[in-house]
Amino acid sequence: TLKISLFAYENTALHGLFDAWTASAQPVLCLVPEGRILPQVGQYFDDFAPQVGSDYVRGNLHVRVLPFVEQERYDLLLWACDINFVRGEDSFVRALWAGRPFVWQIYPQHDAVHLKKLQAFLSLYSRHLDGSASQAVQDLWRAWNRGGEGGATISLEQAWSAFVTELSKLKQHAQYCSRQWAENNLALNLLDFCQEIGTIRALKIEGQQT
């Protein structure tokens, strides 16, 4: 069983992603901490009052709704999963630390400015991957952040399939990146990244909503 954590903002791509997991050849256990995506999770299963403890099964997809957890316990969830869908900046940093393949949902901004920042990080994050693995990461991240539009020639479902196909490489890459980022102070590494893309922003710290 593939274990996936899902912590996300509202996203019109969710049901397409769930469709892919429902039809997956490998069983998927999706763990959803209580948050903004929860109403859409419930809607997929015709439950318009989802809550902590809700448990859903469709095809090869099994979804469990977890309580919202503090950061330290959230780290344990990230480490326990094979793939992590994370949102905002706090969870992004923790996903890097966790050393697991992840998909980042950047906070949406006016005029899609956030997509330029996303692509800048994608270029940095995937530069040590081979061609097919790099493409798989970029296609899925872009599809998730564009509400399911992976590009002119690829759907979210296709992007997910390619991502899973490359999962062994992506696990090794995530562990490599975690070690590299841990060698120096993580905040300094993030500052270097922000300078590289020409956008220095104050990172939201623990306790702030993202």
Model-derived segments and spans:
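Short acidic (Asp/Glu) and glycine-rich catalytic loops that position anionic groups and cofactors
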Residues: R58, L96-F102, L167-Q172
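Short, hinge-like loop/turn segments at secondary-structure boundaries
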Residues: F48-P50, V103-W104, F121-L122
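Post-HExxH zinc-binding segment in Zn-dependent metallohydrolases
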Residues: K117-L129
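Active-site donor-nucleotide binding/catalytic segment of nucleotide-sugar enzymes
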Residues: T1-Q40
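A donor-sugar binding/catalytic signature common to diverse glycosyltransferases
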Residues: F68-K117
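C-terminal amphipathic helix plus adjacent low-complexity
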Residues: H128-T210
